[in-house]
Every structure is written in structure tokens, then in C-alpha cells.
Amino acid sequence: MGYIDRYLTDLETVIRDLSRADVEAVVDGLLLAWKENRQVFIIGNGGSAATASHMMNDLCKLTIVPGKRRLRAIALTDNVPLLTAWGNDASFTDLFVEPFRNLMRSGDVLVVI
């Protein structure tokens, strides 16, 4: 079996083994955020920060229904100067804490990748 066949077989296994209940819970949370006009924050560390940006792009662009309110999503990891300022001046352990104190409200949704 070649590389592509192994990759596709592995991908099929991962998709088949996904918890349908977990995926449904994420979708339900995002739908509720949209219905209640809540903010969705997406964060990740390292390569997952790029995934957070990509997810935010998909949520903001691919969910548009003409004439309907849009989903409000932001990848906090896209603001590198803010994160590194807090990391340098306070602690990299609490990198997201202070920005969330400024931005997050009760009922908002946090997606951590």
C-alpha cells in the first residue's frame, strides 16, 4: 500500500471514529452562540494557532446566509502583538487571560484547539 492509500485509510478511520455526540455538541454550541448573538473565541498554541485562524475564517465566511445575522467569531491568536505583550510583561502561562478579561462576556463561546 502506497503513501496516499495509507493516508486515506488513516483519514477514514479517524473520521469513522469521531464521536458523533461530541461533534453535535460543538455544532449545538455554535448555533446557540449565533442565535443569541454571542461572540465565539477560538484559540490554539503553536500550529493549532493557525488552525484557529482557519476555523475562524471558515465560520465567518462559509456560514453566511443572505439577510440573516452573521456568526461573530474571532481567533484571538491572530493578534500576535497583544499576546506577546502579555506574555513578556506578565506571563506566557496566562497569555489569554487578560485579553479575555477585556473581550469576553457571559455566554460567549470559547473553542480551544
Where are these regions (language model features)?
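Glycine-rich, small/polar surface segments that engage phosphate groups of diverse ligands
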Residues: 33-104
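Hydrophobic packing residues in well-ordered alpha-helices of helical domains and bundles
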Residues: 4, 23-26, 52
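A short, well-structured juxtamembrane/interface segment
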Residues: 18-36
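C-terminal binding/interaction regions
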Residues: 104-113
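Generic N-terminal amphipathic, Lys/Arg-enriched alpha-helix
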Residues: 1-18
